[in-house]
Amino acid sequence: MTIDRSFQTKNAAERARMQALVARLTDPDLQRSLGHRWTVADALLHLAFWDLRAVVLMDRFEREGVGASPMDVETANDTVWAMGRGLPARAAAELAVRAAETAARRIEALPDQLVEAIRARPDAPFTLARHEHWREHLDDIERGLR
């Protein structure tokens, strides 16, 4: 039986959107405030962190089986913001693109059984539909640049 992986098409579309956006961002754009102390670069670094966390968890789940991975989201986001203070804005933007690509490729390589196991958990620590998170923040960035 084939499982529904239609989310991968949406992941690809939002990933392409991210790549195009990052390619046209200027250094002043990356420093533009989005409110709540976040800049465009901070939002992109935030995406990179959550994508790389998903990759680490997929690797773990493939070795050990799918399980919970509780996290204090506010503390994680505050930590990402603090890390951004020491990272060049352009590097954060480029990391976001690489992390999205890594997450998408990792998801595409997951065996169907693991995809089903992750999607079946009500407490899944991340979504395979990465496009949802990307879209939310790319929309914020594009609004902030207007």
Segments the model singles out, each with a brief description of its role:
Residues 11-18, 40-55, 81-89, 93-103, ...:
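Alpha-helical transition-metal enzyme core signature, strongest for iron centers
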Residues 22, 61-62, 107-108:
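Hydrophobic residues in alpha-helical segments
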Residues 1-6, 52-102, 146:
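Short, helix-capping/interhelical loops that line the mouth of catalytic, cofactor-
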Residues 19-20, 109, 113:
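Acidic-glycine-rich active-site phosphate/pyrophosphate-binding loop
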Residues 1-36:
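Long, hydrophobic N-terminal alpha-helical segment
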Residues 1, 8, 33, 86, ...:
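A generic helix-loop boundary/linker signal
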